[in-house]
Curated annotation (Swiss-Prot):
Major localization listed first in the record, in broad terms: membrane
Enzyme class: translocase
Gene3D superfamilies: 2.40.30.20, ATP synthase alpha/beta chain, C-terminal domain, P-loop containing nucleotide triphosphate hydrolases
GO molecular function, a single term: ADP binding
PROSITE patterns (alphabetical): ATPASE_ALPHA_BETA (PS00152)
Species for this entry: Paracidovorax citrulli (strain AAC00-1)
Official protein name in the record: ATP synthase subunit alpha
Membrane topology term: Peripheral membrane protein
Quaternary assembly: F-type ATPases have 2 components, CF(1) - the catalytic core - and CF(0) - the membrane proton channel. CF(1) has five subunits: alpha(3), beta(3), gamma(1), delta(1), epsilon(1). CF(0) has three main subunits: a(1), b(2) and c(9-12). The alpha and beta chains form an alternating ring which encloses part of the gamma chain. CF(1) is attached to CF(0) by a central stalk formed by the gamma and epsilon chains, while a peripheral stalk is formed by the delta and b chains.
Subcellular location: Cell inner membrane
Record keywords, A-Z: ATP synthesis, ATP-binding, Cell inner membrane, Cell membrane, CF(1), Hydrogen ion transport, Ion transport, Membrane, Nucleotide-binding, Translocase, Transport
Amino acid sequence: MQLNPAEISELIKSRIEGLAASSDIRNQGTVVSVTDGIVRIHGLSEVMQGEMLEFPATKDGQPSYGLALNLERDSVGAVILGEYEHISEGDTVKCTGRILEVPVGPELVGRVVNALGQPIDGKGPINAKLTDVIEKVAPGVIARQSVDQPLQTGIKSIDAMVPVGRGQRELIIGDRQTGKTAVAIDAIIAQKGQGVTCIYVAIGQKASSIKNVVRALEQAGAMEYTIVVAASASESAAMQYVSAYSGCTMGEYFRDRGEDALIVYDDLSKQAVAYRQVSLLLRRPPGREAYPGDVFYLHSRLLERAARVNADYVEAFTKGEVKGKTGSLTALPIIETQAGDVSAFVPTNVISITDGQIFLETSLFNAGIRPAINAGISVSRVGGAAQTKLVKGLSGGIRTDLAQYRELAAFAQFASDLDEATRKQLDRGARVTELLKQPQYTPLPISLMGATLFAVNKGFMDDVDVKKVLAFESGLHQFLKTSHGALLERLEKNRAFDKEGKDEAELTQAITAFKKSFA
């Protein structure tokens, strides 16, 4: 068969036109070494800091991802998120072009998830409609609003003396076994019916401890508005490091839509240790206490994201869907100290970043004063502006009584005979100290807390035996609930005494009536 040149060129042209040339340009590299969850990769020329890298799937077909942290001249250092036993030298690694993301939204509420937002509670998949990046820039000064709304923790000593406002960062610091987690869990339980979504991030905790926390939240009915992000001690250092940022992103979803959220980081000491481990394995130069140079930035960029944002920010973010509402993310980071040393590297860093701190002391805890809060050195730098009028008006005397009591108690040890005024102050201080004790998982509503503070401030407890103070308080609460429910409802609603003085008169009358019946 004879073909002329014109036919040949037509044939080639038609073949070229009919060719389905689908090309997939991907930036990929090769694994050079794998050690302790750290992978060195050669050939990833267009990778971003913090980008998700796709590794070969696990034996059961689950996708495997890593996080690019070290960008060097001829190689990339990455941490594997999850299992790494199946990865070997020579494996292909692909760029995804995406920064690490986690699912966000109301679908996560009531669930227990890992650091990547994957469910680990056995209640089925989470069908979240949205995802968001874990690393974000915190809202600027213009987008913020001053903290002036209270976040009630239900704990007498905190709400009276170191109040927390919505959008504040209040550090809980103390040695191990001083009740730090208990304070945070009580604060979460106290948000029931307050319209606050809570996120509890467990970093480096024992799996059994996390299970106990979840059980306590379920029994109190608090899981209905809580997300638990768990990175237990058995998980990799990378997962423990990432978990705090994942939880923060989940909280920001609510903040940016004009809602209120509370996040607890339990605890940031273990997150810093996990980050130190990752940094040392990546051969980054160590600094003080072998922590890397950016350990301050590790916590500052996390805690600065807790803020109260103004209505303009919320309106711009939601594209006009939500108007006239401010949003807030309140943070309660926890730091564990060694033998009460608050001047160590990580504690001083976090103290300088936060808006105040609640100090818990072993000596107080062992003396039976629980929560073991040292009111003398605990402060709230911005919460005073957010404190409810009811508690603010009554709490000034409490702090003064305690301060004078501590001063006189030390002096009274050496004095044999004390004058009447000193004895009165010592007696009042002993009763206030006793009154600030509170059982775990029993946060108080604002009305009952106000009644308690009113009773001690007006001297109704001065002649009650110290050992019977707590019995007097619980009896008074029960009496008010049964006989003066309307008064409690008014105090709960108005969060202040009325200007005419009727509420104060009724409360005085009620306490006097109860005291006559109290044996």
